[in-house]
UniProtKB/Swiss-Prot annotation:
Entry PTM: N-terminally acetylated by acetyltransferase NatA.
InterPro entries with a match to the protein in the record: Ribosomal_uS11, Ribosomal_uS11_CS, Ribosomal_uS11_sf
Positions where N-acetylserine occurs in the chain: 2
Xref: Gene3D superfamilies: Ribosomal protein S11 (3.30.420.80)
Described function: Component of the ribosome, a large ribonucleoprotein complex responsible for the synthesis of proteins in the cell. The small ribosomal subunit (SSU) binds messenger RNAs (mRNAs) and translates the encoded message by selecting cognate aminoacyl-transfer RNA (tRNA) molecules. The large subunit (LSU) contains the ribosomal catalytic site termed the peptidyl transferase center (PTC), which catalyzes the formation of peptide bonds, thereby polymerizing the amino acids delivered by tRNAs into a polypeptide chain.
Natural source organism: Saccharomyces cerevisiae (strain ATCC 204508 / S288c) (Baker's yeast)
Gene symbol of the encoding locus: RPS14A
Record's protein name: Small ribosomal subunit protein uS11A
Intracellular or extracellular location(s): Cytoplasm; Nucleus, Nucleolus
Region (Disordered): 117-137
GO CC term (a single one): 90S preribosome
PANTHER family registered for this protein in UniProt: 40S RIBOSOMAL PROTEIN S14/30S RIBOSOMAL PROTEIN S11
Subunit relationships: Component of the small ribosomal subunit (SSU). Mature yeast ribosomes consist of a small (40S) and a large (60S) subunit. The 40S small subunit contains 1 molecule of ribosomal RNA (18S rRNA) and 33 different proteins (encoded by 57 genes). The large 60S subunit contains 3 rRNA molecules (25S, 5.8S and 5S rRNA) and 46 different proteins (encoded by 81 genes). uS11 interacts with eS1 forming part of the mRNA exit tunnel. uS11 interacts with snoRNA U3. uS11 interacts with MPP10. Component of the ribosomal small subunit (SSU) processome composed of at least 40 protein subunits and snoRNA U3.
Annotated PROSITE patterns: RIBOSOMAL_S11
Compositionally biased tracts (Basic residues): 128-137
Length: 137
């Protein structure tokens, strides 16, 4: 199968951009619509040297720009965005890189279709880490 997607004239070729923004790193992962084939996957940690900067908005922006360039190479012109935080028993708010990655994808010329939050939310979860009296500083 060839990696270049053919588009009919005047139509968008969609992919799915999955942005996982934790407080330690940001992943920008683009797949085809079915989710089976990975087109590009770049993390904030691949773009910066210091460990503390992996989750920064700047690292997320660089990662998203790399992914967008690869998408255009392959022929994808638009993406549906699924943004995700750590979730579960941990935080349900995306890290600092989530917003920056989304903005960088839009500014790099990719059309944005739907934006969806797919953070896993427990219906009735296991016990949260930290014990009965919580984390004591």
């Amino acid at each position: 199968m060839s990696n270049v997607v053919q588009a009919r004239d005047n139509s968008q070729v969609f992919g799915v951009a999955r942005i996982y923004a934790s407080f330690n790193d940001t992943f920008v992962h683009v797949t085809d619509l079915s989710g089976k084939e990975t087109i590009a996957r770049v993390t904030g940690g691949m773009k910066v040297k210091a460990d503390r900067d992996e989750s920064s908005p700047y690292a997320a922006m660089l990662a998203a720009q790399d992914v967008a360039a690869k998408c255009k190479e392959v022929g994808i012109t638009a993406v549906h965005v699924k943004i995700r935080a750590t979730g579960g028993t941990r935080t349900k708010t995306p890290g600092p890189g989530g917003q920056a990655a989304l903005r960088a994808l839009a500014r790099s010329g990719l059309r944005i279709g739907r934006i969806e939050d797919v953070t896993p939310v427990p219906s009735d979860s296991t016990r949260k880490k930290g014990g009965r009296r919580g984390r004591r500083l």
